[in-house]
Amino acid sequence: MKFLDSCILIDYINGRLPIDEDKSNLYINSIVENELIIGARDKKDLATINKKISLFPLLDIDQDIMDLSTKLLNRYKLSHNMSIYDAIIASSCMIYDLPLWTYNKKDFKFLDIGLV
């Protein structure tokens, strides 16, 4: 089981990264979903994005995740330039106890989460 960062899904959607694993064990949240949707260039692109990301279970972003993301931002925004998106993704990984599959390891290496 893993949490997928948007950078991994961008390569998957564009055909640069096959994902052969059981997609029911690869999770996203609405932050990742929105990061992908905002990158759509036209209606066809948007339809492709929505079709491909619908294969992955969507984890809820609850108050515990938002509270933890606020703590992470207070601690790491100035020292590591943490974004709100990365804070919510990291908090989701921590709360759901999932490693993060990302190319952007530098954005998360200072946190107590597994990186793939």
Regions of interest found by a model, annotated:
Residues M1-V32, I37-K51:
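Short, well-structured N-terminal submotif of metal-dependent ribonuclease cores
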Residues K2, N25-Y27, L55-D60, P99:
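Short loop->beta-strand "edge-of-pocket" segments that line small-molecule binding or catalytic clefts
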Residues I13, L58-K106:
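Active-site neighborhoods of divalent-metal-dependent phosphate/nucleic-acid chemistry enzymes
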Residues E35-I38, K44-L46, L73-N74, S83, ...:
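Residue-level signal for functionally critical sites in structured catalytic/ligand-binding pockets
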Residues I37, I53, P57, K77:
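Conserved short-loop catalytic and cofactor-binding motifs
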Residues D42-F56, D64, S69:
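Ligand-binding grooves and catalytic loops that recognize ribose/phosphate and carbohydrate rings
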Residues I113-L115:
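Ligand-binding "clamshell"
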